[in-house]
Structures are given as C-alpha cells and as structure tokens.
Amino acid sequence: MKRTSIILVLACTIALIASCKEERELVETMYSGFMTGQTDSQGYISVLKDDFGKLYKVSEETDKFRPDTLYRLVVSVALDEDNNARVIQAVPTISYIAPHDSIIPDTMRVKDPIKIESIYIGGGYLNINVGIKVKNEDSQHSLFYTCLDNTDRLQFTFYHNAYGDEYVYTKHAYVSIPLYGYGLAKNDTVFLSCKGYEEDYDYKLIYK
C-alpha cells in the first residue's frame, strides 16, 4: 500500500511538472512592428532589439540575409519572458543615411503621391509605413528620401515615381530614416514633407 502511494505521488508530481512546463512554453507575446536585427556569420538573424533598447535572442533559424549585418526590419515575432524571439516574418525596411537634396538630379525629382499610414520616432529612426497605389503585385515604382540642405532645420522629403502606373490597390513599403549623426537633442523637432493622394503631408515630430 505504501509503495502504491509513493508511485501515485510521483506520478502526480511528474504530471504537475509537465503541466507547468507546457503552460510556460505557451506564454508568448506576439509583436508586429519595427525592430533592429543583427545577422550572424551565416546570415541568420541572431539578435533583435526593440525601440526601447531591449534585446531578444532569436531562438530559431530565420530567412537568410547578408552575414554580419545590422538591419532595420519590420517583423512579426513571438516574444517570451526569457527574452527569446521566434521570428515569424522579417522584412527589411528602406533605410540609409539621407543624401543632401541638392545632389539629386532633376530627372529623379518626381513626386507622385504616397499615403503615410503611420509615422513615429523610435529606436533612433524616423519610422514610416508608406502606402503606394499600384496596378498589380509586379508594378515597379521608385521611392527614396533626401534631407533638405538649404534650411537650418532637419527636414526630409520623399520622391516617388509611379512610372504612369494605374491606381488599383495599395501596396506597403516600410521606411526607417536613421537620425544619428545630426546632433539631435531631446525635444528637437524633425520635419518631413511629401505629396499625398488627397492632400500633401507636412509632419513635425519631437525627438525623444
């Protein structure tokens, strides 16, 4: 009888441990948005950093990118309480140091409209979700930004060439403009202007 009781206690303990383990594995927080990723020597994303500076170790192999490279990404990830990240999808953003507007040739100064879906400053970047109306998935557009250099304020502008494409549905592009190197202080203002479909955009954002 005593032996039977011990076996039952052990069985209950094992079942409880397994149940707790299973419950812990299910505790994940889904996140979709901008993050910074570092690839390893094989091109897999190894570490992600959110816009608050928190680091997450990537727990599974991802799509391959350029090895040993820092990427600004839009990701869909599952984050757990041990700071591990399981990457579901990762899309590189359009991200580069903005050239001075004065060096852009006139042939590239096309301002077809775009739609700003969302915009905010975070992680040291000006992050923008851009909507572009296209005819189909294979439509080819050009989209880039510059920094105006004939002004005493930090102002960016977009150029978009639709090459005469028809407006059928909206396709998204993600942009992260690096803000380091401009000597910005807390509460400085960052400006962005571009042509919109219904009205033009003129944003003033506070650097924090």
Which residue ranges define each predicted feature?
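Bacterial signal peptide processing site
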Residues: 20-24
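Sec-dependent N-terminal signal peptides
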Residues: 6-14
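Positively charged n-region of N-terminal signal peptides that target proteins for export
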Residues: 1-5
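First exposed extracellular module after export/assembly in secreted or surface-exposed proteins
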Residues: 29-208
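C-terminal motif of bacterial Sec signal peptides marking the signal peptidase cleavage site
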Residues: 15-19
